């Protein structure tokens, strides 16, 4: 506040307020700052979790972390994928989800899916204005594609052809893919060709072999031991 000059003074009087520096006021300011920082941290964490959900990471794995994820992610940044295989319950999906989280945090467009998910999305276009090409393009052109549990269900010729189209497109455009499976690549070829064309199955396996570093997961079923 500025008051006119008084009592013969040549300059106006300036009356202002200074913050109180007493211990109680300082403590209140620190508490307010701490609460604000916590609020912002919660909002940022929720934004990240929503980004993970949009990428297709399942709720159980939204907080997934793994000491192996950093090495795989380093390869992803250079355009190299990963083939993670091993018995049921050894942490394959957990690891793939941890990599997907890191890719989202890197700003990559990520899509996490599985064979039934791919087929469901393709079939959802039947009788609509959407096309199979729209779905396949979304899977082929994202920065990182994660296909979980490949080979769990033996595919038909039609299903196998769609998977080949996605894998081949990513192979030709040098976009990374992370795949999990119960089978090593040799066994995967036999599994995929059980109800489908063996040549297409082997073509998928060949491309994955070149595109991906192999990571074998070993050990007992973590779910049965309460570690899932």
Please tell me what each predicted stretch does:
Residues 93-107:
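P-loop NTPase Walker A phosphate-binding motif
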Residues 79-97:
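Walker A/P-loop nucleotide-binding motif
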Residues 108-109, 141-144, 171-179:
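Loop/turn-to-beta-strand initiation segments
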Residues 1-70, 226-228:
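A short, basic N-terminal segment
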Residues 73, 104-141, 154-157, 161:
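Short glycine-rich substrate-engagement loop in P-loop NTPases that contacts/grips substrate
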Residues 57, 68-81, 85:
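P-loop NTPase catalytic core of nucleic-acid-dependent motor ATPases
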């Amino acid at each position: 506040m500025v008051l006119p000059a008084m009592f013969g003074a040549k300059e106006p009087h300036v009356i202002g307020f200074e913050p109180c520096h007493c211990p109680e006021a300082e403590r209140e300011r620190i508490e307010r700052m701490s609460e604000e920082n916590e609020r912002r941290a919660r909002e940022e964490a929720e934004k990240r979790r929503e980004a993970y959900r949009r990428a297709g990471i399942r709720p159980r794995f939204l907080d997934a972390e793994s000491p192996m994820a950093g090495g795989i992610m380093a390869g992803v940044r250079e355009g190299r994928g990963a083939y993670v295989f091993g018995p049921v319950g050894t942490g394959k999906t957990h690891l793939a989800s941890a990599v997907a989280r890191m890719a989202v945090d890197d700003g990559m467009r990520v899509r996490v899916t599985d064979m039934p998910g791919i087929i469901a999305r393709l079939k959802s276009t039947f009788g609509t204005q959407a096309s199979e090409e729209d779905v396949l393009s979304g899977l082929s052109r994202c920065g990182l594609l994660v296909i979980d549990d490949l080979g769990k269900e033996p595919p038909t010729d039609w299903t196998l052809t769609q998977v080949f189209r996605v894998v081949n497109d990513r192979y030709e455009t040098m976009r990374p893919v992370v795949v999990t499976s119960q089978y090593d690549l040799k066994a995967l070829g036999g599994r995929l060709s059980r109800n489908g064309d063996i040549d297409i199955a082997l073509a998928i396996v060949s491309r994955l072999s070149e595109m991906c570093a192999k990571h074998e997961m070993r050990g007992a079923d973590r779910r049965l031991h309460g570690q899932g």
